Amino acid sequence: MAVISLSTSSAQDITPSLSGFSDGIHHWNLEHKDRRYSRYEPCQYREIADNLIAYQNSDGGWPKNIDWLGVLDADSVKAALKERYRRSTLDNRNTFPQIEYLSDVYLLTDDNKYRDAAERG
């Protein structure tokens, strides 16, 4: 059973919470201060969830310290990460927020790819 943590400002403006990603994004920003790139807006929850799927490791977990809202090539980012950051981890509040976010996006979209990715996590 998924726990939904959607934030709402109006009935038409429902988005999954991004608060669980703040620690990892903060660490990403510390490591990549000079990097300039586009970022998804919170209302682009499908694109953010697709990012989560793109970064998901074969064991179902995720690397740490990623800007999940970044419009970046996931393969290039993963290749540039130090080995210890590529591995799946629970460090820096990692993995549980991804599962929760994917579950919330599944509840909003009924798209099984988000449910399947959450279950793999």
What does each of the following model-derived ranges do?
Residues M1-D13:
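Bacterial Sec-dependent N-terminal signal peptides
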Residues D13-G24, D34-E41, A80-T95:
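Solvent-exposed loop and edge beta-strand segments that line ligand/cofactor-binding
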Residues G24-Y40, I48, I53-A54, F96-D111:
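Well-ordered alpha-helical scaffold segments within catalytic/enzyme domains
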